[in-house]
A protein has these predicted regions:
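The feature marks the mature, well-folded catalytic cores of soluble enzymes
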Residues: 1-131
Length: 131
């Protein structure tokens, strides 16, 4: 979600936690997942909180081949109906993007969708939107 108020949001996209979550990249930084069931319970609580706030929540299936797939914010940047699909910073995350891109193409009907190319790499979660 961008840095705007929750009451300005109508829809959210999340992805289920894969069985492989214990191998997520965060574990290499010493802060990785400890308990998948706890993570799933927290994720369900997050989904419920969004729904309680009146947000329509779409949940994509987990991809058990990609432990980081639940971090959907890294796979797209959406501002004012424009979508940027970045090349993820870590090569292991590149194949997480197609289901998210397909969803955005389908759900955002006439949105301008741009894909990064070349050697540039970026995770969408590294973007801070101001104003």
């Amino acid at each position: 979600m961008a840095t705007v108020r929750l009451d300005q949001k109508a829809r959210a996209l999340i992805r289920a936690i894969p069985d492989s979550y214990h191998s997520a990249l965060a574990k290499f930084f010493g802060t990785g997942p400890k308990d998948i069931e706890t993570a799933r319970n927290q994720h369900n609580a997050y989904k419920s909180a969004l729904e309680s706030a009146g947000i329509e929540v779409f949940m994509l299936e987990a991809d058990h081949n990609h432990p980081d797939c639940l971090f959907v914010e890294d796979q797209a940047v959406i501002i004012d109906g424009h979508v940027l699909l970045p090349v993820p910073g870590h090569p292991s995350r590149v194949n997480e993007q197609p289901p998210i891109a397909d969803f955005l193409v389908r759900e955002m009907g006439g949105a301008q969708i741009c894909r990064m190319s070349g050697d540039a790499r970026m995770d969408g979660g590294d973007i801070l939107r101001l104003g």
